[in-house]
């Protein structure tokens, strides 16, 4: 096998769910990936070594903006939140637009509507509505088992009526409420315990959270462990926060209206992130879930992809 030539492909990197560079969750976006061969997509993702890389294609429905394919270092995934927010802002800015906008991004879960709002400081806030309303799975393993996985005490994990639960808005997460922000910071993923208990379960990725009493009743601190997708810890996870919105809304006493929460994630990783989540309820049923945040451009460049002949 000899290298005969190379092709060039433009990319941009952004930090998502933050208003400043070097915070939030890193993302690489290829605005036009049509010429990138299928077999190279996962290799490119691993080269960046970010939580996700997005490859953009013309939409199947011409009324939509783009079709997205989202890759983690482990596999392609049907839906992830921070690539949705980051890609929407990137595509909006790269199109030359400067004001508010609506777009629809085609992802593995289906069409994802996104609203973009221009902020006074020149940045943009993007909010997406989940294509799939929250689906609730079976109860989680015992608090003792979860404590072993998270290097915590069983007492750190809340029980009924706020027990851990599997939730999916397109990508399942085990949502685990903890008693304190201190417990959130203290948690550590024990991979072997995770592998023996959760790896083969429906909701194998873990999202832990606790109310932050210093920031208000609707403010939470969170962390996300995604070992099944080769991401030990993620600094900002829109899809998991969508699940959190579903979890909180399902337990809220309010039967109607819009519920809103703010989540800080990534603090322990040195990449602080802020995610805004909402859920609509009608007659006690969840009718919509939305996740939003800002993003900033960090780098841009050209990937030189070798072409090989045998």
What are these regions (language model features)?
Residues 2-80, 85-310:
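Active-site proximal loop and beta-alpha junction motif in alpha/beta enzyme cores
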